[in-house]
Amino acid sequence: MKSITVICFLALCTVAITSAYPQEPVLADEARPFANSLFDELPEETYQAAVENFRLKRATCDLLSGFGVGDSACAAHCIARGNRGGYCNSQKVCVCRN
């Protein structure tokens, strides 16, 4: 049983190392056609409204609550955004302080 576990662990490590191996760098000019988004297609007024109302979905509190680090991860996320910290509210949504 131990040998099967070791073999599976080594196979997992091999897959992780080979998938992390760097590929050829992609030039910005080559990547631009693939990076088109909805924001590129909008008129200027609609673009401004979309940027103002754009909200990233937060999964920090909900996913990490099982490990007991939900509030800490939320606070670290908010500090990285330039706020003073944050907390998870009762609905498992990260709320950043100003």
Curated annotation (Swiss-Prot):
Induction: By bacterial infection.
InterPro entries on file: Defensin_invertebrate/fungal, Scorpion_toxin-like_sf
Signal peptide: 1-20
Residue stretch(es) of the prosequence: 21-58
CDD domains: DEFL_defensin-like (cd21806)
Annotated keywords: Antibiotic, Antimicrobial, Defensin, Disulfide bond, Immunity, Innate immunity, Secreted, Signal
Subcellular compartments: Secreted
Ribosomal protein among keywords: no
Function, in words: Antibacterial peptide mostly active against Gram-positive bacteria.
Family affiliation: Belongs to the invertebrate defensin family. Type 1 subfamily.
Stated name of the protein: Defensin-B
Source organism of the structure: Aedes aegypti
Gene field: DEFB
